[in-house]
Amino acid sequence: MTEAIYLEVSEKTEAAKKAGRRVSVSGMLKFLGVSRSGYLAWLHHVPSDTETRREAVKAKIQDIYDDSKQNYGAPKITVELRKTGEVISERTVGTYMHQMGIRAQWSKPWTITTKDSDFSTELQNILDEQFNPDRPNAVWCSDITYIWTIDGFVYLTSVMDLFSRKIIAWTLSETLEVSCVIDTINKAKARRNIDQPLIIHSDRGSQYVAKEYKKATENMQRSYSKKAFPWDNACIESFHSIIKREWLNRFKIRDYKQAYQLIFEYLEAFCNTKRIHSHCNYMSPNEFERVYERTHTEAELLAG
């Protein structure tokens, strides 16, 4: 606390000098309740090597934190620091972050917003909570989430590849029509080269049991969350919670246009390209898929 006061006095003194004004340092110190001798000792203190390194690490922490759109906590920042060669513990990073007054965005656990529309036994849970396929385009999952704006709710439909947790397609709409889901599925099919059987998993919402959806996914194996167990779709439900926690909830969103711009920025410039994920060995989804493709290609060359 005292160091912060000294820093404030120093900054105000420098600002006054640059402006050509006189300022009473003693008066400021007296008003703030700190000693002149203590301030002068602080002012002429030469940082030790340890202090210099600590401040350098804190600067790196701030850069990583800002680059993550101020989302990363100590675990992910520790991983990123170690990638640059820093030898540091997660506990130390957490201590520094506390001193710096920064922390990860907090989120309450995601809540269920979808009501099942079909409880028939014909809809099978093929996925059965097996959330870790061994290749891309083995399992996709899809879901819809509500986003509040001043103009009214808009709806984000997403398709995730469970292998990398990459959002491979998304659509923002002003209605809950099944056509919005179909558009998203078609985008996903156009962007991915599907040459093997594919499972697509969803909850039992009306859009996902409609005949139009079944037609759009006729060459896929449709899998549905069990009756009254929508958390069987936990990965993409969790993603929708994360995009709100890390990004959308910071803004008082005016309308569809602003919501679209914010979602585009988060998904296309951060989530798939930069945001590290524990599931991906602390790589981004794009990097995780590139590593798979490179390893898979090398294995094929060695085998052939």
Q: Which role does the model predict for each range below?
A:
Residues 113-117, 202-204, 210-212, 224-244, ...:
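RNase H-like two-metal-ion nuclease catalytic core shared by retroviral integrases
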Residues 218, 242-304:
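C-terminal domain-tail junction helix/linker
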Residues 1-25, 30-32:
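Helical coiled-coil/dimerization "stalks"
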Residues 1-7, 36-135, 229, 284-293:
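Basic, flexible linker segments flanking DNA-binding modules
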Residues 148, 152, 170-193, 209:
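Active-site beta-loop-alpha junctions of metal-dependent nucleic acid enzymes
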Residues 129, 133-168, 174-175:
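An active-site-proximal beta-strand-loop segment
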Residues 9, 29, 39, 61, ...:
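Mobile genetic element proteins and their domesticated derivatives, centered on retroelements
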